[in-house]
Amino acid sequence: MALSHPRPWASLLLVDLALLGLLQSSLGTLLPPGLPGLWLEGTLRLGVLWGLLKVGGLLRLVGTFLPLLCLTNPLFFSLRALVGSTMSTSVVRVASASWGWLLADYGAVALSLAVWAVLSPAGAQEKEPGQENNRALMIRLLRLSKPDLPFLIVAFIFLAMAVWWEMFIPHYSGRVIDILGGDFDPDAFASAIFFMCLFSVGSSLSAGCRGGSFLFAESRINLRIREQLFSSLLRQDLAFFQETKTGELNSRLSSDTSLMSQWLSLNANILLRSLVKVVGLYYFMLQVSPRLTFLSLLDLPLTIAAEKVYNPRHQAVLKEIQDAVAKAGQVVREAVGGLQTVRSFGAEEQEVRRYKEALERCRQLWWRRDLEKSLYLVIQRVMALGMQVLILNVGVQQILAGEVTRGGLLSFLLYQEEVGHHVQNLVYMYGDMLSNVGAAEKVFSYLDRRPNLPNPGTLAPPRLEGRVEFQDVSFSYPSRPEKPVLQGLTFTLHPGKVTALVGPNGSGKSTVAALLQNLYQPTGGQLLLDGEPLVQYDHHYLHRQVVLVGQEPVLFSGSVKDNIAYGLRDCEDAQVMAAAQAACADDFIGEMTNGINTEIGEKGSQLAVGQKQRLAIARALVRNPRVLILDEATSALDAECEQALQTWRSQEDRTMLVIAHRLHTVQNADQVLVLKQGQLVEHDQLRDEQDVYAHLVQQRLEA
């Protein structure tokens, strides 16, 4: 709560004083005497202040404390009246009270405000406007659960049955006590015991079926959310993955989706069960003793006030824990994924220290969460114990007055204890539900994100020549728009020709390959394939016709066949072997135990570097592409394999772009393009350059 804004508090004070002045006049004489008039006065103050502050746009800043300001007086005198003869039952209306009483009322609000400001986490109030979106998120979660509606209906039916059975058990427990305490009636005693057993068995069976139905629905919802999120992530643009850490994405896919699926099956389940049971239990409590029931209701404001202080702190620390766990997971993935590099540089201890620091941050947050939760539970328990003592005191008075039997008081205490338990469940599950809705907000932000990509094309001609034209192409990465990577590139890749693209590191060679695969869009100029803009081609068609083999090929866990036929449907074994033969991979595949069905391990860890390159080339060739891009992908191949690749290229006049660093590659090229600082270097300029790439091209020209 922001204490630095006096305007809303001054407005609240002036409006309240004006309203009290009206209630002190003839309007106040219309209110009934005693407690009903006191409650009517408080309710009237609350409604008028709430409406006026909402119209004035100030409700968000001071609305939390309106119930405290308006209802403290009725609650106090109601407690005095319900306790009985031990205290006076005369009432004092705020409108007609002395200035000292009014100042005490305002002082209680000021003290509560100070406690709230100290205990609430920083920025809690600023986050409240965003929480208005929780209702929309909950509705969206319900819509997401629509396919599981039959299972949820069954679960809620069993929930209602379990609650119904459970509510009768304390009633018959009280009857047993009354039978044992008075004239013993064997038939009545046997009947009470029978119904206790019947309701207990029925409650247990219904609760088990309820839990099983909710868990089944939860598993289906969880799988559906994960599938949708993973599908959405794979369709994002590359800039998104450059800006978002892998650990964060893994956290969303694992922990956040689980929290989302629990929202209905766990949170809504317990919340609805507790709500229905609280209403039903209060009905039975009213049958036993209305006076004790109204006295027990006074525990609700204290519980809500404690929740108002605890819940924002709990939500804040949970969000910090989510981020800390994601960072710790990121450290593990980086260290394990780059284990060879870690060992090569002897950095094992450094990675252990990084992970220890990340875990220490998690430990601090976990300790803070558990400490605050423990204090909250202690306060709740003390309040519940105090209320039980008060109810026992008043209950004994009613027993002595003959208003309640001993069994009735026992039933009431059992009901009251169960009500307290379910009220705490309502408060706790409300906070937990907000946590899960917060996780849903992050997941939905990914599901709703629209990739910065052009509309998918539809061109899929039966025959493609493979002519590639860069026409004054410029490009800057989305994360660094002020720094151009390519500037005004104009050149043509001809079918049946090999074009070597050379240049120093950072000159834009890999960016040219990325543009040619339609991974990014030029910021200027046009990129044409057979005279048509690249973006107009169908996505799957384009990536069968234009294929890249990288310098460090990426393989996946699975068999040799799975990796060669990756992304293709109904790829026959004969096609796989033909591509492997063209890539000179058939020799080592034939030596494997299961041939093309042999598992190669995670990222192809069971293969040598040269074998990985051959499999990657075979994966490209099996698509029979018209344009092949080799990013120094033949560095680990022998002369025979390179010659086989040249033979494959010349068979159907395919277009080949080779990003080269070796003289041998440049000498075999039909065309050499030199990039420097994102621009093509002309041959006249090349003669004046003294770097290694100019030397390579000059040697090729002289040859």
Swiss-Prot record:
Which reaction does this enzyme catalyse, per its entry? a peptide antigen(in) + ATP + H2O = a peptide antigen(out) + ADP + phosphate + H(+)
Give me the segments passing through the membrane.
Answer: 7-27, 57-77, 99-119, 149-169, 188-208, 267-287, 294-314, 375-395, 409-429
- EC numbers for this chain: 7.4.2.14
Lumenal-side stretches of the chain, per the record, are 1-6, 78-98, 170-187, 288-293, 396-408
Record keywords: Adaptive immunity, ATP-binding, Endoplasmic reticulum, Immunity, Magnesium, Membrane, Metal-binding, Nucleotide-binding, Peptide transport, Protein transport, Translocase, Transmembrane, Transmembrane helix, Transport
Q: Which SMART domains match?
A: AAA
Q: Name the GO cellular-component terms.
A: endoplasmic reticulum; endoplasmic reticulum membrane; membrane; MHC class I peptide loading complex; TAP complex
Where on the tree of life does the source sit, at the highest rank? Eukaryota
Q: Where is the ABC transmembrane type-1 domain?
A: 152-435
- Binding site residues for ATP: 503-510
Q: Tell whether Transmembrane is among the UniProt keywords.
A: yes
What membrane topology does this protein have?
Answer: Multi-pass membrane protein
The annotated site for Inter-subunit salt bridge with TAPBP falls at 16
Q: Where is this region: Part of the peptide-binding site?
A: 301-389, 414-433
| All ranges on the Cytoplasmic side of the membrane | 28-56, 120-148, 209-266, 315-374, 430-703
- Pfam families, alphabetically? ABC_membrane, ABC_tran
Task: Report the InterPro entries cross-referenced here.
Answer: AAA+_ATPase (IPR003593), ABC1_TM_dom (IPR011527), ABC1_TM_sf (IPR036640), ABC_Tap-like (IPR013305), ABC_transporter-like_ATP-bd (IPR003439), ABC_transporter-like_CS (IPR017871), P-loop_NTPase (IPR027417), Tap2/ABCB3 (IPR005293)
Q: Where is the ABC transporter domain?
A: 468-702
Question: How does the entry describe the domains?
Answer: The peptide-binding site is shared between the cytoplasmic loops of TAP1 and TAP2. The nucleotide-binding domain (NBD) mediates ATP hydrolysis coupled to peptide translocation. Two ATP molecules are accommodated at distinct nucleotide binding sites (NBS) at TAP1-TAP2 dimer interface. Each NBS is formed by Walker A (GxxGxGKST) and Q-loop motifs from NBD of one subunit, while the NBD from the second subunit completes the active site by contributing the C loop motif (LSGGQ). Each ATP molecule is coordinated via the beta- and gamma-phosphates to a Mg2+ ion, which is necessary for ATP hydrolysis.
Matches recorded under NCBIfam families: 3a01208 (TIGR00958)
| Assembly description | Heterodimer of TAP1 and TAP2 (TAP1-TAP2). A component of the peptide loading complex (PLC), interacts via TAPBP with MHCI heterodimer; this interaction mediates peptide-MHCI assembly.
Family under the similarity heading: Belongs to the ABC transporter superfamily. ABCB family. MHC peptide exporter (TC 3.A.1.209) subfamily.
Protein name as it appears in the record:
Antigen peptide transporter 2
Identify the species of origin.
Rattus norvegicus (Rat)
Q: Which gene encodes it?
A: Tap2
